[in-house]
């Protein structure tokens, strides 16, 4: 089986090589997004994997399907960059990554608290020995209403 990987980061390359060898898969890698302009790079591949920058709309999905691709994998939690209706109509199988819900929830809460407490500007100041408090008055989470806009297993942990 041949898989074409796009948006490949340097930190992924070693793992890709290990898995490809272990499974006996031919793997082509590209740092670029998959586009209609470079669509011929999927020729001969049964599967395509991307991150979230590639917009797999109906036109791009049709083009990969016409070149023999049967499987689309996104290395992201969400799949909102993929036209899932078009993929289903074209007979393409789609999957996405599964991240530990608790880790994602912890990261989300951390970002919320960092934003509320204006941590980034405080950190910048501390790096130049400026410990003044002007403009750093944050807010407390207990005084705010927090909405969780999704209903998946990730957001349920937040």
Features from the language model and the residues they span:
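Phosphate-binding beta-alpha-beta segment of Rossmann-like dinucleotide-binding domains, i.e.
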Residues: 90, 95-145
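An N-terminal-biased, well-structured beta-alpha scaffold segment characteristic
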Residues: 2-93
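Short secondary-structure transition/capping segments
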Residues: 14, 73-86, 120-130, 144-150
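A structural signal for well-ordered alpha-helical scaffolds and beta->alpha junctions
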Residues: 9-13, 101, 105, 155
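Glycine-rich adenosine-cofactor-binding loop
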Residues: 7, 139-158
């Amino acid at each position: 089986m041949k898989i074409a990987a796009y948006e490949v980061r340097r930190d992924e390359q070693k793992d890709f090589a290990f898995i490809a060898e272990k499974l006996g898969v031919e793997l082509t890698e590209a740092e670029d997004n998959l586009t209609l302009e470079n669509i011929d790079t999927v020729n001969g591949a049964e599967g395509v994997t991307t991150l979230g920058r590639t917009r797999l709309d109906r036109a791009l999905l049709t083009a990969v399907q016409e070149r023999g691709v049967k499987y689309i994998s996104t290395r992201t939690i969400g799949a909102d960059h993929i036209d899932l209706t078009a993929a289903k109509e074209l007979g393409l199988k789609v999957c996405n990554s599964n991240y530990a819900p608790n880790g994602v929830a912890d990261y989300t809460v951390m970002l919320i608290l960092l934003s509320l407490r204006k941590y980034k500007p405080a950190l910048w100041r501390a790096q130049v020995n400026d410990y003044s408090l002007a403009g750093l008055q944050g807010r407390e989470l207990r005084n705010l209403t927090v909405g969780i806009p999704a209903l998946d297993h990730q957001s349920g942990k937040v």
